[in-house]
Amino acid sequence: MLEAMALNPVTNDTFTAEVLEADAPVLVDFTASWCPPCRAMDPILAAMAEDRDDLKIVSVDVDSQQELAVRYGVLGMPTFMLFNAGTPIANLVGARPRKRLESELREALMQQPAGR
């Protein structure tokens, strides 16, 4: 089983290149090693990362990357933020089944103007 921290971890130094300047939508998993619901999401996110080539999935360890957590107002975990064209378009807090997460992501992406 893959751990979230192994799921393309990003830092304050790499966030712009990996998330804000990405060519595809990016799901950012704000997570912590001590968070049981975060750990429950690890296999779901790992499977999604393996199955989907239209979505980049990265993780941010809120303990070591507090500046990013503060910048994006992360208060509960796990928090999933979907970025498209460098802009956060969805903010989802809490563990959820894969079907629900994918449905919420699809809905957020469909709400985007054409050309993004």
Predicted regions and their residues:
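Short pre-active-site segment immediately N-terminal to redox-active cysteine/selenocysteine motifs
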Residues: 23-24, 30-34, 76
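Conserved helix-turn-beta segment immediately C-terminal to the redox Cys motif
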Residues: 24-25, 40-60
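Non-catalytic, surface beta->alpha helical segment in thiol-disulfide oxidoreductase systems
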Residues: 82-116
